[in-house]
Amino acid sequence: MTKLTARQQQVFDLIRRAIERSGFPPTRAEIAAELGFSSPNAAEEHLRALARKGVIELAAGASRGIRLLGIDDAPHQFTLPHAGLMQLSLPLVGRVAAGSPILAQEHISQHYACDPALFTSKPDYLLKVRGLSMRDAGILDGDLLAVQKRTEAKDGQIIVARLGDDVTVKRLMRRPGGLELIAENPDYENIFVKAGSADFALEGIAVGLIRSGEL
């Protein structure tokens, strides 16, 4: 691996940990806050230095458009697309009716053509975020969350789950006797789900985020 300065190594390690923990990289603002930079612009300078050294790649215009390169065991990595390959066509899921599959045709409002470089792993669909319960994870009302269908998730990953008639986005943590779905906003309460609860179903994990104007 290319030799990095101590500060560059800190930034690189932070990106790697974020991908391992949640499935997608941090924003510039999150890097600045975590490492004590004066502004997101300082984080951007370090990211560009890492890109010049060939250890990450930046996707222009995407707040989380960061990929780790050249690391055999890099978490949640995928093969980089060759120039000219078709973009991903992802269904955008709107409101989900109770009891029906999340990708049922009536839930799909439209399809988006997306650059695969925006995501840490190939998503199956986009889910429009409603509310601010995940604000402190950088996920805001109206954002499009890229979701990969899964029936299992690791502790700390951001998931999409059914709770009764609702679909929610939360951070997953296993607890004695069940699961805790953690909100990333102190104004919202965490949700405890008892083991074996029939009201809970894991729909997938977050693998990227698109903010309005990035498509």
Swiss-Prot record:
Positions in coiled-coil regions: none
Positions bearing the site annotation: Cleavage: 98-99
SS bond list: none
Domain of life of the organism encoding this protein: Bacteria
MF term (GO), any: serine-type endopeptidase activity
UniProt EC number: 3.4.21.88
Keywords: Autocatalytic cleavage, DNA damage, DNA repair, DNA replication, DNA-binding, Hydrolase, Repressor, SOS response, Transcription, Transcription regulation
Catalytic center residues: 133, 170
Membrane-spanning residues: none
GO aspect biological process, one term: proteolysis
Catalytic function, reaction form: Hydrolysis of Ala-|-Gly bond in repressor LexA
InterPro entries the UniProt entry points to: LexA, LexA-like, LexA/Signal_pep-like_sf, LexA_DNA-bd_dom, LexA_repressor, Peptidase_S24_LexA, Peptidase_S24_S26A/B/C, WH-like_DNA-bd_sf
DNA-binding region: 28-48
Function: Represses a number of genes involved in the response to DNA damage (SOS response), including recA and lexA. In the presence of single-stranded DNA, RecA interacts with LexA causing an autocatalytic cleavage which disrupts the DNA-binding part of LexA, leading to derepression of the SOS regulon and eventually DNA repair.
Family under the similarity heading: Belongs to the peptidase S24 family.
Description of how the protein assembles with itself and partners: Homodimer.
Name this protein carries in UniProt: LexA repressor
Organism expressing this protein natively: Burkholderia cenocepacia (strain HI2424)
